[in-house]
Amino acid sequence: MNRTEQKQQAFQFIDSHRDEMVALWQEVVNMEGGPHEKPGIDLVAGRFRQVLDEVGAAIRTVEFAQAGNMLIAELPGPIATPGVLFLGHMDTAIAAGAIARQPFTIRDGKAYGPGVLDMKGG
C-alpha cells in the first residue's frame, strides 16, 4: 500500500469513527486533571488504559506517588514494520474547577474546553 492509499485508509477510519472519537474527547476533557492533580490525571490515564486495552495493546502502568501515573502501551504488529511513537501528557495547565466554568462544548464547528488543543485533543 502506498502513502496515498495509507492516508485515504486513515481518513476513512477517522470519518467512520468520528462520533465515538468526539465522545471520548469530550469525556477526557471533562475530567479534572490540572497541574499536580494526581487523582484527576490518574482518572484520565485509567480511561486511556481502557481504550488501549480494547484495541489489544499490551499496557504497563508506571505509578508515581506524587505525580500522575504513566502509561506505556504497545500495539501488536510485525517487528520488521517501522514503528510509530505517540507521546503525550494527560494533565492540563488549568487549575481545578475549570470544567464547571468551561466544560467541553462544540460551537460553530470548534471545540472548547480545558486541554482540547493540547494533549487531551490528541
What role is predicted for each listed range?
Residues N2-V116:
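Acidic/His- and Gly-rich active-site-bordering loop/insert found
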Residues L117-G122:
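Active-site alpha-helical elements of protease catalytic centers
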